[in-house]
């Protein structure tokens, strides 16, 4: 069987979803028009999201009649004509869900209609992402010139771990995403995720946005607080639309309203995880199209715009010492499995010039003594932790650490990149409950000239600029004092002390708003062991 295409070259295949909180609707409707050797079949599957649906087959001996039935059924469910399927969804009707597979096929169909350019041999010997859509002749030339270089087995294992689809699916399931889609490659398109971010921003505005967060600044921060700000509240249409375009599996429970910044932040974390997972899967799928004698994970590693090397035993020991530090409120301990040093990153930060005050010269006779050698000033850089889900690690290695998308009022200090000196704090963001093995990034961060804060401030970046500072340092109650140098940069390792200043924060955070002030130095694989109450008190 093969899917029949319309006059524009797009297949008669569509995935529809409809969520209506008021009626406890959370269902899908799949449609396909198939050619089976001259007979035409319209395949329909409908059911509740997360469960196996009911399948119906409609047979036709005439293609026009089959198309007419397909398009009429599509209009019945969406109130859109087939040629309008890319338009805005109609309220209280099914929405078209754009899958990654459909989006990729569409691009391929369009490229076939365009004239192919003459092959050009790229004389530059560069690493990193290879351009897609290259003509066959060019691929053959590149294949002959491929250097035979075996990658360290540890690196292959690393790539396999961070791109493991089963691990990704486990995390996505925990985030309530509809795992019934199958592998991440069969999930949503990246364009669909962008639409999801936009809807969440609209919902956030409807519950007050930054103004609502400012009104709660004087009170203790509660993770699941529903904002008590006078507003019309989030539109049910927007929430229904979001759930329809980003399908969730809630079983037979009523889909929850997205009516707080904490819930919006949780949904954004889901989209972030989906984005990273889909990007990794698309890369793997693209590699599988080309035959090669190389291991697929070696080829995947070669697409990275950076080099990774296993660290020496000495550095591994120092990183392990740093991981041994645990916050008193954290219920697990960390230990080192492996670590890799990042070399030649895609974006090398420029080192900020150090201002040296000129000492005024004394008048008088010239001294015949030679000047004493100048002692370099102590570095203000620190090695700090950044935690993220395993779904995001490959994307970060490809693109670097990115600033959050949208006006994220759920973040305590605005849209920066967050770092911590206590590793267990960063490990919280790795979703350690889902796996006993997580990945953390140990980053070189410029900590000079910070704006010091003792409570949440969502406009921290604006206050930082007004104060002519270069970063934000959120001072927590517990702060480490002891450090160990790793390749000349201090990293915090132990001896948590309580500061004298009054603060609403438990642990230190460093927030950066300029990419030149941080870079990834080590990718660290960490084992997570949950502690009992007795072990925590010891």
Curated annotation (Swiss-Prot):
For this protein, the record's CDD domains field holds:
parp_like
> What GO MF annotations does this protein's record show?
NAD+ poly-ADP-ribosyltransferase activity; NAD+-protein-aspartate ADP-ribosyltransferase activity; NAD+-protein-glutamate ADP-ribosyltransferase activity; nucleotidyltransferase activity
Q: Which residues form the PARP catalytic domain?
A: 309-535
**GO terms for cellular component:** nucleolus
- State the superkingdom: Eukaryota
Q: Name one Pfam family in it.
A: PARP_reg
Q: What is its EC number?
A: 2.4.2.30, 2.4.2.-
Q: Which InterPro entries match?
A: ARTD/PARP (IPR050800), Poly(ADP-ribose)pol_cat_dom (IPR012317), Poly(ADP-ribose)pol_reg_dom (IPR004102), Poly(ADP-ribose)pol_reg_dom_sf (IPR036616), WGR_dom_sf (IPR036930), WGR_domain (IPR008893)
Q: What SMART domains does the annotation carry? A: WGR (SM00773)
Its principal location? nucleus
Which cellular compartments is it found in? Nucleus
- The WGR domain is annotated at 1-94
Supply the alphabetized keyword list.
Answer: DNA damage, DNA repair, Glycosyltransferase, NAD, Nucleotidyltransferase, Nucleus, Transferase
Report residue spans for region: Disordered. 104-133, 357-381
Q: Which GO terms describe its biological process?
A: double-strand break repair
EC class (word) = transferase
The reaction(s) this protein catalyses? NAD(+) + (ADP-D-ribosyl)n-acceptor = nicotinamide + (ADP-D-ribosyl)n+1-acceptor + H(+); L-aspartyl-[protein] + NAD(+) = 4-O-(ADP-D-ribosyl)-L-aspartyl-[protein] + nicotinamide; L-glutamyl-[protein] + NAD(+) = 5-O-(ADP-D-ribosyl)-L-glutamyl-[protein] + nicotinamide
Domain PARP alpha-helical residue range list = 148-285
Q: Where is the composition biased (Basic and acidic residues)?
A: 105-126
What protein family is recorded?
A: Belongs to the ARTD/PARP family.
Q: What does this protein do?
A: Poly[ADP-ribose] polymerase modifies various nuclear proteins by poly(ADP-ribosyl)ation, a post-translational modification synthesized after DNA damage that appears as an obligatory step in a detection/signaling pathway leading to the reparation of DNA strand breaks and programmed cell death.
The protein depicted here goes by the name: Poly [ADP-ribose] polymerase 2
Organism from which the protein derives: Caenorhabditis elegans
Q: Gene of origin?
A: parp-2
């Amino acid at each position: 069987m093969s899917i029949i295409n319309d006059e524009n070259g797009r297949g008669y295949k569509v995935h529809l979803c409809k969520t209506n909180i008021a009626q406890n609707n959370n269902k899908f409707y799949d449609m396909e028009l198939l050619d089976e050797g001259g007979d035409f079949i319209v395949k329909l599957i409908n059911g509740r999201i997360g469960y196996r649906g009911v399948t119906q087959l409609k047979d036709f001996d005439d293609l026009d009649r089959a198309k007419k039935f397909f398009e009429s059924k599509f209009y019945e469910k969406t109130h859109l004509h087939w040629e309008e399927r890319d338009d805005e969804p109609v309220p209280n009707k099914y929405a078209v869900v754009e899958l990654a597979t459909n989006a990729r096929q569409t691009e391929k169909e369009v490229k076939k209609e365009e004239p192919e350019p003459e092959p050009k041999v790229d004389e530059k010997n560069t690493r990193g992402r290879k351009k897609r859509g290259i003509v066959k002749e060019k691929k053959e030339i590149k294949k002959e010139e491929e250097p035979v270089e075996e990658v360290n087995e540890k690196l292959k294992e690393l790539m396999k771990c961070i791109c493991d689809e089963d691990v990704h699916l486990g995390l996505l399931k925990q985030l309530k995403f509809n795992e019934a889609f199958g592998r991440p490659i069969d999930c949503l398109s990246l364009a669909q995720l962008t639409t999801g971010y936009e809807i969440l921003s609209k919902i956030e505005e409807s519950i007050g946005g930054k103004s609502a967060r400012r009104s709660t600044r004087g009170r203790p921060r509660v993770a699941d607080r529903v904002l008590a700000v006078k507003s019309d509240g989030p539109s049910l249409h927007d929430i229904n639309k979001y759930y329809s375009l980003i399908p969730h599996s809630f079983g037979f429970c009523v889909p929850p309203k997205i009516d707080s910044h904490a819930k919006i932040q949780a949904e954004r974390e889901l989209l972030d995880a989906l984005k990273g997972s889909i990007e990794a899967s698309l890369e793997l799928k693209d590699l599988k199209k080309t035959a090669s004698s190389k291991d697929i994970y070696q080829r995947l590693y070669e697409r990275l715009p950076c080099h990774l090397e296993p660290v020496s035993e000495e550095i591994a020991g120092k990183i392990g010492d740093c991981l041994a530090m645990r916050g008193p409120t954290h219920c697990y301990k960390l230990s080192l499995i492996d670590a890799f040093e990042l070399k030649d990153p895609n974006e090398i930060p420029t080192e900020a010039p150090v201002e040296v005050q000129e000492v005024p010269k004394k008048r008088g006779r010239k001294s015949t003594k030679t000047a004493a050698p100048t002692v370099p000033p102590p570095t203000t850089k620190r090695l700090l932790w950044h935690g993220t889900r395993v779904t995001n690690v490959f994307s970060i290695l490809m693109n670097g650490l990115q600033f959050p998308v949208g006006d994220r009022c759920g973040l305590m200090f605005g849209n920066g990149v967050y770092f911590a000196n206590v590793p267990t704090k960063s490990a919280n963001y790795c979703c350690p409950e889902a796996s006993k093995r997580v990945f953390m990034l140990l980053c070189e961060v410029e900590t000079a000239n910070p704006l010091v804060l003792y409570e949440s401030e969502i406009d921290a970046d604006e206050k930082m600029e007004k104060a002519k500072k270069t970063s934000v340092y959120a001072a927590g109650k517990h702060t480490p004092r002891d450090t160990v140098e790793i390749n000349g940069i201090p990293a915090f390792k132990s001896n948590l002390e309580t500061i004298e200043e009054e603060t609403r924060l438990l642990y230190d955070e460093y927030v950066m708003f300029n990419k030149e002030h941080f870079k990834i130095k080590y990718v660290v694989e960490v084992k997570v062991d949950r502690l009992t109450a007795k072990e925590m008190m010891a």
